[in-house]
Amino acid sequence: APIKGYSVTVXLYIFDCQKWSSNYPHKPNFSDATDPKGPWCYTTDYXGAASVTRSGLRGDEQTPHRHTFSPQSFAGLTTACVKGTGEGYRGTAALTVSGKACQAWASQTPGDVYSCQGLVSNYCRNPDGEKLPWCYTTEYCNVPSCTGGPTGSEYHEILTPAQDXYTGIVEDYRGKMSPDAGLEENFCRNPDQDPQGPWCYTXNPEAXPRYCDVLSVVGGXEAQRNSXPRQISLQYGWQTVHVQSIHAEPRGVDIALVKIAPPAQLTACVITXWGETQGTGEDVQFCAGYPEGGTDPVSLVCLEPCVLAPVLVGVVILPXNDRXQ
């Protein structure tokens, strides 16, 4: 029979004692004939009060939470990020968003470990369909989402230094990622659709992958033909043409008007500009050039007032004593 007057709280086998008022994990059911010799207690080991064949886990590792979900199986497993609500996440993140360490999943024993859920160590998981992977603490886990806006997965420029000036190293990711991910040398890439953009492994063996300092393209659109204003590229070309006639008049000018035949083959070009009409009487004619020097009033940037027709038809050169139009 139990020896009255003892208040021992640890059993002979170094298991925490179950409270006498508790029915978990053992429902009290004993008699004088079945009691062990000496002071005893029900332990938190599921195998029994006096069993040494199954060690079990300490009862304090079952706190502060007990599992209440039912096991299920999920497809589409991921390790680096979260798809949807993360039921298939099998990575090794084990901290909450505020940096709290996760409680070990094995602390749910006695009970089913639910191996189909990948409940390993204290890594973040989502076995019950919560909105994000979680662990037994009070917060959701800090795991990046697999979906979102542009992530730089198509970035293939040759840029190696990471954001904190570490040098990238070559890492064999080809067997794990898409064959067209551009994983050559040690250049910055984003083969896993990381929402923070291109990254690389560094030469520091103790450091995690580093994100690269790559400029992002924001805004802008392709310029359409005849749109105003627009930028164009002027490139040199060479043609051999025949001169039909030369007009050197009026006297006093330093250029001549040359007529060629057949006409030169030119590329169509539309230029939008602005300038001062200075009494020409036409919205498509404006004066350019200062004989005294200075800034030309004609600019190839569309500012106010803009000319109505954005087409430069021709240039008229007059003698030096007249105004150039």
From Swiss-Prot:
Protein name according to UniProt: Plasminogen
Mind listing the GO biological process terms from this record? blood coagulation; fibrinolysis; proteolysis; tissue remodeling
Keyword annotations of the record: Blood coagulation, Disulfide bond, Fibrinolysis, Hemostasis, Hydrolase, Kringle, Protease, Secreted, Serine protease, Tissue remodeling, Zymogen
Instruction: Name the major location.
Output: secreted
Which organism encodes this protein?
Petromyzon marinus (Sea lamprey)
According to UniProt, the reaction catalysed is: Preferential cleavage: Lys-|-Xaa > Arg-|-Xaa, higher selectivity than trypsin. Converts fibrin into soluble products
The text of the family note is:
Belongs to the peptidase S1 family. Plasminogen subfamily.
This protein's superkingdom? Eukaryota
What GO CC annotations are associated with the protein? extracellular space
Any matching Pfam family: Kringle
